[in-house]
Amino acid sequence: MKLFKKLAAAVLVAALALTMVGCGAGGTGSAFDLKNEVLNVIEDSYCADHKVATHTTAMDAAAAALIEKAAADEAAKDDDVTVKDLLRNNGTGNYIAIFMPYGQLSTELMQYLYIGEMEDTLDKAIQYIANEGYYNNSDTAVKIGSPVIGEDDSIEIGAATGKIKDKNYLVLLVKKAEA
């Protein structure tokens, strides 16, 4: 009977540990979760401000294509070329790209801070859309083409994760929603 109780306790502890840390692709702490959390926070924030931010798979695909093109660019081998340059030079269309490297964000606090920084960068990027100085000095925002987005405009958003210059990046693409 004692052996059974010890075995049952060990199984319970193992089950609790697995549910707390998550495991496998798409589990807690994965890039997939981070991407979706960023998108959800932006949609919720816009909704709270009585504006509309719509996540679309087309925007996700555009973000993924941008990452692939930037990573494959021969200029990526040059240490003097930044990720910002690669994104700007390989994008088509009229977007704002918000990009940040991410490592293993193993705590909810670190994920919260990362997501908050992405959201804050997006707010500033839209607020200062006409200010080239903002974009020249920003390490995490770049204009692709000539985006025109007002602070009260509805937006379309999409995101993807991928490796550029040997670092993992989350790239959020934003454009003015078509009426």
Please describe what each predicted stretch is.
Residues 1-11:
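Bacterial N-terminal signal peptides that target proteins for export
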Residues 18-22:
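C-terminal motif of bacterial Sec signal peptides marking the signal peptidase cleavage site
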Residues 26-98:
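Short, well-ordered surface patches within globular domains
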